[in-house]
């Protein structure tokens, strides 16, 4: 310690020499220890930087890595050993079940092959069906059938004809003929054509087949108008006879149904009521007079099949009871199938004159009677009336109407008494006395069958909602009968006939205030008077005169009132 320090510190106690020596010795030891430390540090640094130290470090690291690798190897060996054991077990299992797997593989292979073959067969059949479906319209067109009506033609039956008009626009179905159903159909092909004209039924079938070639439309060109001739009359008679004789056989068929069931259907059907004004009546009459008679009517409001079928049968029966038949001409016509009338499809379109829209059976019978009387002059003068056939047909038809309760006894007597009186006036014919007595007893004084005036007039139906429509029906039938007289003549005579029809329509319009029974009586009487005076439709020179009856007796003055 310096002298200044000591002076500043102040006075201190004096140090003994022994103490100073101890202190000097300690200082020297400290200096030596520090020097040694520094030397050791230098040596350490030299050792760390030496290669021996570095190699030793690497050795230690490699030794640790080797230990780790050995440990991993041991674990891998254990894992591989486990996998080997599992593989051995799986191999043993596969060897044990190889036979079962082979059997399953074979079975699955057969199932796959069968499934593929089945699919191929379905595809082949589908291709064949598509080919057949494509060929069917072509075959139908080659056969003269329209593609749109091919299906309907396979479901319907031959078209019945009445009074020279096509009763339905449906097509023909080819069915297996019944051996005992129509015995007269075999001899119908062997009859000689005494008229000198082709049969009307064959012509009608040919025209019906031509309809599809013209696009399926139900009309006939102007040049193919048909005249109402003896062949059409005998065709309707023969059709009714065949249907009457084969009613029992047709009732046994599953698809034909019985006549009683069809009558029940007729009773259950409700007719559509229409309110027709007088202007519409006159316009319809003029339109009918201007249009030619067509084979198939245009699309009109249709009626049900059973109702149309029954009306057609009754009209044919009235036809057979009021006109004569000729054996040679009957055999020259081939009737349709015995069940064709009963199998007529529902909803077929029918002319208004024969199956009215309101479904009045009595009105159809009266109209059919008037139309049949128009054809009576066409019968040959030397032809003899078959009284037995007419009487049997009339009796069967009367029993049919009474059985099915379509007309009451009074209405039936009123409708049929004019036919009975006409049979009395015809040469070589007699009215059935028994039938007349029965009708007279049941009807009483309501309808007289001995009056000359009643034989040419029909009783009036009570006024109801169908009064105007029935008057329209009679007017249409009257104009239709007049048109049938001039169809076969030249154009000038047809024009004159149309003018006469128009004049009659105007006359009916002017006389609209007349009562309904008087108008109906005048229309029907005018038609019957033509048949009564024996005017012929075949004569072209008397075509115009036939439209107006000639006055030959005071009784005929009542006929002229209709034209005034």
Swiss-Prot record:
Residues 447-463 have a biased composition (Polar residues). Keywords: Cell projection, Coiled coil, Cytoplasm, Cytoskeleton. Centrosomal protein required for establishing a robust mitotic centrosome architecture that can endure the forces that converge on the centrosomes during spindle formation. Required for stabilizing the expanded pericentriolar material around the centriole. InterPro entries: Centrosomal_kizuma (IPR026742). Residues 28-50 form a coiled coil. It is found in: Cytoplasm, Cytoskeleton, Microtubule organizing center, Centrosome; Cytoplasm, Cytoskeleton, Cilium basal body. It comes from Gallus gallus. Residues 493-519 have a biased composition (Basic and acidic residues). Residues 1-21, 178-201, 304-345, 442-465, 487-519, 531-564 are annotated as: Disordered. The lineage of its organism: Eukaryota, Metazoa, Chordata, Craniata, Vertebrata. GO terms for biological process: spindle organization. One of its GO terms (cellular component) is cytoplasm. This is Centrosomal protein kizuna. The keyword GTP-binding does not apply. Belongs to the kizuna family. Residues 313-324 have a biased composition (Low complexity). The gene is KIZ.
């Amino acid at each position: 310690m310096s002298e200044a320090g000591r002076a500043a510190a102040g006075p201190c106690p004096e140090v003994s020499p022994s103490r100073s020596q101890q202190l000097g010795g300690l200082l020297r030891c400290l200096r030596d220890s520090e020097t040694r430390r520094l030397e050791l540090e230098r040596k350490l640094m030299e050792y760390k930087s030496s290669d021996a130290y570095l190699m030793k470090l690497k050795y230690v690291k490699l030794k640790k890595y080797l230990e780790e690798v050995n440990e991993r190897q041991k674990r891998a060996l254990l894992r591989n050993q486990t996998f080997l054991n599992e593989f051995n077990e799986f191999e043993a299992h596969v060897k044990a079940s190889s036979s079962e797997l082979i059997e399953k593989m074979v079975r699955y292979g057969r199932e796959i092959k069968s499934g593929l073959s089945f699919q191929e067969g379905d595809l082949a059949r589908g291709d064949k069906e598509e080919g057949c479906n494509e060929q069917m319209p072509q075959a139908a067109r080659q056969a003269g059938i329209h593609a749109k009506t091919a299906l309907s033609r396979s479901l319907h039956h031959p078209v019945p004809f009445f009074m020279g008009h096509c009763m339905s626009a449906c097509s023909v179905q080819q069915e297996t003929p019944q051996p005992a159903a129509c015995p007269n159909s075999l001899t119908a092909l062997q009859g000689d054509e005494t008229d000198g004209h082709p049969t009307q039924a064959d012509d009608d079938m040919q025209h019906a087949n031509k309809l599809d070639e013209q696009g399926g439309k139900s009309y006939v060109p102007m040049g193919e108008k048909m005249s109402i001739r003896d062949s059409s009359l005998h065709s309707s008679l023969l059709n009714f006879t065949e249907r009457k004789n084969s009613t029992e056989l047709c009732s046994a068929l599953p698809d034909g149904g019985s006549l009683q069931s069809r009558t029940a259907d007729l009773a259950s059907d409700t007719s559509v009521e229409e309110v027709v004004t007088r202007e519409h009546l006159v316009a319809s009459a003029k339109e009918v007079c201007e249009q030619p008679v067509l084979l198939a009517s245009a699309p009109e409001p249709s009626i049900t099949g059973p109702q149309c079928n029954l009306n057609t049968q009754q009209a044919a029966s009235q036809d057979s009871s009021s006109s004569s038949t000729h054996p040679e001409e009957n055999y020259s016509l081939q009737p349709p199938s015995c069940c064709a009338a009963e199998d007529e499809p529902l909803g077929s379109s029918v002319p208004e004159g024969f199956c009215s829209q309101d479904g009045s059976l009595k009105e159809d019978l009266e109209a059919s009677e008037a139309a049949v009387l128009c054809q009576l002059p066409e019968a040959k003068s030397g032809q003899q009336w078959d009284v037995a056939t007419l009487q049997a047909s009339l009796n069967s038809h009367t029993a049919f109407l009474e059985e099915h309760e379509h007309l009451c006894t009074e209405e039936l007597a009123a409708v049929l008494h004019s036919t009975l009186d006409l049979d009395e006036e015809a040469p070589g014919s007699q009215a059935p006395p028994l039938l007349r007595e029965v009708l007279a007893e049941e009807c009483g004084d309501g309808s007289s069958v001995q009056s000359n005036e009643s034989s040419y007039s029909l009783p009036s139906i009570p006024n109801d909602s169908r009064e105007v429509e029935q008057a329209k029906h009679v007017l249409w039938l009257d104009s239709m009968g007049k048109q049938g007289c001039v169809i076969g003549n030249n154009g000038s005579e047809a024009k004159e006939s149309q003018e006469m029809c128009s004049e009659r329509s105007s006359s009916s319009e002017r006389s609209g205030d007349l009562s309904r029974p008087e108008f109906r009586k005048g229309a029907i009487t005018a038609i019957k008077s033509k048949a009564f005076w024996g005017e012929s439709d075949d004569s072209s020179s008397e075509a115009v005169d036939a439209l107006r009856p000639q006055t030959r007796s005071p009784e005929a003055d009542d006929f002229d009132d209709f034209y005034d």
